[in-house]
Design a protein with these regions (language model features):
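ATP-binding N-terminal substructure of ATP-dependent carboxylate-amine bond-forming enzymes
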Residues: 1-100, 131
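Fold-independent oxyanion-binding glycine-rich loops
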Residues: 10-11, 31-34, 148-149, 162, ...
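Short amphipathic alpha-helical segments and helix-helix/interface helices
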Residues: 18-19, 111, 134, 170
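Short beta->alpha linker loops
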Residues: 52, 79, 105, 125-131, ...
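CheY-like receiver
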Residues: 60-64, 135-136, 169-172
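A conserved helix-loop-beta module that forms one wall/lid of the active-site cleft
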Residues: 89-156
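Conserved ATP-binding module of the ATP-grasp superfamily
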Residues: 120-122, 139, 143-146, 158-187
Length: 187
């Protein structure tokens, strides 16, 4: 392969992607907000931009003289499909749509789309306050699950039963959300 591959994010989970891209013959451009992110040592070029800021990322990319030689944009083990789609679209590269990326990275938007499309999904609501969480539990009972709308994996996800401290649940989930939004759903 020839050309450049842009990898959004450079955490430890992404080292394999950087190494594999290099083995495939790509020149790797890595981006991360942290200039000391572990995977950046495997990149040929480093750009400092938050993985969650699509505009800052594309501005950093376009600062490269030969940014048009980028052949693809990927991420691995990083919940930033919107940034990947945004950058790919700006560079005229194939990718999922911005709408699909937005739906896949925001659990509340995804659940609302499921509901609007008559896809069977558990009862859910956005909890903007601790009182919203209390109200949901009063209405729907236990068990339930609380999670950040924008988290990945199981970060910030809490199973709620009658022994749970709801104030702690709310603050814990919120602390794992970049958007400061959480969702509660019946389990």
């Amino acid at each position: 392969m020839e050309g450049k591959l842009l990898i959004i994010g450079a955490g430890i989970e992404q080292i394999y992607a950087y190494q594999t891209a290099k083995k495939m013959g790509f020149s790797v451009v890595g981006t991360d907000a942290n200039p000391n992110a572990p995977a950046l040592i495997y990149s040929d070029e480093k750009l400092i931009a938050s993985t969650r800021d699509p505009q800052a990322t594309i501005e950093a990319v376009k600062s490269l003289k030969d940014y048009k030689s980028i052949k693809g944009v990927i991420t691995l083990a990083n919940d930033v499909p919107y940034t990947v789609a945004y950058v790919a679209e700006a560079l005229g590269l194939p990718s999922i749509s911005l709408q699909t990326a937005a739906l896949s990275s925001d659990k509340l938007k995804m659940k609302n789309r499921f509901k609007d499309s008559d896809v069977n999904t558990p009862v859910f609501t956005e909890a903007k306050t601790y009182q919203d969480l209390q109200k949901f539990i009063q209405q729907w009972g236990y068990p339930a699950v609380a999670k950040p709308t924008d988290g990945r994996g199981s970060r910030g996800v809490v199973f709620i039963d009658e022994n749970s401290d709801l104030e702690w649940v709310f603050s814990y989930c919120l602390s794992h959300s970049c958007s400061n939004k959480i969702i509660i759903e019946k389990f």
